[in-house]
Each structure stands twice: as structure tokens, then as C-alpha cells.
């Protein structure tokens, strides 16, 4: 009996520009994803922004940015929603995050598995140390995603620098993904 205010789709290859309108009309006011950040040629310039749909409706959008920090290299495009809770991933996720002028916190989702696993003992052992603060590493804090997103959304609403993206969210990295239901794909595109 709980209505979700967050659409959580971390592992999807692209989104129609009609989605913000559909979400708003469904009572959803926050959207979270991660894979769209993988594009290499036309890199998404934002990780926290308002996504404006085809009818002008906008939705608060947050991209997860967890990745390993590799010393001496700039952040990579690939991010994960299956992070390990360790200093390397916390630093990598924070370094990769692009909207530090709006918000100085990042959400790192961690656990073993492909999008459905839970924390392993090593994650929790790292957390016991990282929550106390380690020099040079962002502080770790566990909380519900909904609470985090609501706080960041409020910051974004108050900040004039919060960017807006208009149109579809496209993942060029997976362009040409095949389907066994080509007719459905064609009709979906036409209906958009």
C-alpha cells in the first residue's frame, strides 16, 4: 500500500522524451538511472538535472556515478549501480559526479549481484571504517534512497544553476541492440 515517488531504472538503454509526462501523471517526481552515462561520443553533460519532456513537463533526474578511481586517469564513462563499498569506488563516484556546484553528495548503491544482490561482509566492514571518516575519502552514510533523493531534489529546485535536459535520453553505447519483436519496437517508436 505505498505509492512510489521514484522511478528506479538503472540498467536501461534509453528513454523516450515522453517519459517525464508519463511519470508526472503517475505521481512520480524523481527518476534514477545509471547506464545513460556510458555514452562516449555524445557524453551526457549532467548527473543531476531536470529532464524536460515533449510537452514541457519536467522531472528531477539523478544519474548514479559509482566507479573505480584509477590514479592518474580522468574518470571513465562506465559507471555501476553494483558498486563495492570501498574507498576506491567512493572516490571514483565522487570524482565522476558533474554537478558539485549544486550538490556535494553522491549515491553509491552497493552489493553483490546484478542489480538485486545485497551487501557482502566486506562492504559492511568497510562501512564501519568509512562512516567515521577517512582522510581523502568521501564520508559514507547509509540511508534510504528516497530520503537522499528528496534532499538532493530540494537543493536542485533552489539552485539557479541546476541544468535542464530536453528530449530523449539516448545510450549510444548500445545502439543497434536487437529485438525479436521488431514490429513492437516500430509501433512504440511511432506512438512516441
Predicted regions and their residues:
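Catalytic-domain carbohydrate-binding cleft regions of carbohydrate-active enzymes
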Residues: 1-192
Amino acid at each position: 500500500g505505498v505509492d512510489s515517488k521514484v522511478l528506479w531504472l538503472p540498467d536501461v538503454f534509453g528513454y523516450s522524451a515522453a517519459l517525464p509526462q508519463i511519470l508526472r501523471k503517475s505521481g512520480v517526481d524523481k527518476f534514477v538511472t545509471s547506464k545513460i552515462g556510458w555514452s562516449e561520443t555524445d557524453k551526457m553533460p549532467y548527473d543531476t538535472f531536470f529532464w524536460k519532456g515533449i510537452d514541457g513537463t519536467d522531472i528531477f533526474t539523478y544519474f548514479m556515478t559509482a566507479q573505480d578511481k584509477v590514479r592518474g586517469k580522468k574518470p571513465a564513462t562506465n559507471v555501476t549501480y553494483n558498486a563495492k563499498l570501498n574507498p576506491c569506488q567512493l572516490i571514483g563516484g565522487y570524482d565522476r559526479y558533474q554537478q558539485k556546484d549544486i550538490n556535494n553528495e553522491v549515491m553509491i548503491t552497493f552489493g553483490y549481484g546484478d542489480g538485486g544482490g545485497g551487501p557482502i561482509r566486506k562492504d559492511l566492514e568497510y562501512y564501519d571504517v568509512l562512516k567515521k571518516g577517512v582522510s581523502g575519502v568521501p564520508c559514507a552514510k547509509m540511508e534510504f534512497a528516497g530520503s537522499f533523493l528528496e534532499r538532493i531534489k530540494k537543493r536542485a529546485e533552489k539552485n539557479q544553476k541546476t541544468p535542464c535536459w530536453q528530449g530523449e535520453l539516448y545510450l549510444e553505447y548500445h545502439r543497434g541492440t536487437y529485438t525479436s519483436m521488431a514490429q513492437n519496437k516500430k509501433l512504440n517508436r511511432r506512438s512516441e
